[in-house]
Amino acid sequence: MKRRTAREKALQALFQIDVSDIAVNEAIEHALDEEKTDPFFEQLVHGVLEHQDQLDEMISKHLVNWKLDRIANVDRAILRLAAYEMAYAEDIPVNVSMNEAIELAKRFGDDKATKFVNGVLSNIKSDIEQS
C-alpha cells in the first residue's frame, strides 16, 4: 500500500471513530475494505489514538476564534493525522506531512479547508522546529 493510500484510509478510520464511536478494529476493517493491512496505516491510526490528547492540545493552541470540537470532523481528523506525523514520525520530513495533509484537505474538505489546515500546520511546524 502506498503511503498516500495509507493516509487516506487512516483518515477514513479516524473520521469514523470520531463521529460514530465505532470500535477501532471495526473502523480499521471498514477503511481497509478487504484490502490487506499495512504497517504504516496501522501506525497512523493507533498513533493518533494513543497521542490524541497531546495532538488536540497542539492543534487547539493554534485555533484562532475556534474550538477543536467546532471545526469540521474531517478537518479535525486531517489535523490530528498530520500533527501525529509531524511530532512522532521522525522518518517523515515535516514538509511531506504538511503537503500530504493539504492534499487530503483538498480531496475531503470544503473550499476553506486547505488554507485552514495549512495555517494550523504551519504554526505547529514552527513550534516543533523551536523545540
UniProtKB/Swiss-Prot annotation:
Single GO MF descriptor: RNA binding
A Gene Ontology cellular-component term: cytosol
Ranges that cross the membrane: none
Pfam families membership: NusB
Keyword list, A-Z: RNA-binding, Transcription, Transcription antitermination, Transcription regulation
SUPFAM superfamilies assigned: NusB-like
Record flagged with keyword RNA-binding: yes
NCBIfam families with a match to the protein in the record: nusB
Function: Involved in transcription antitermination. Required for transcription of ribosomal RNA (rRNA) genes. Binds specifically to the boxA antiterminator sequence of the ribosomal RNA (rrn) operons.
Family: Belongs to the NusB family.
Protein name: Transcription antitermination protein NusB
The organism of origin for this protein: Bacillus subtilis (strain 168)
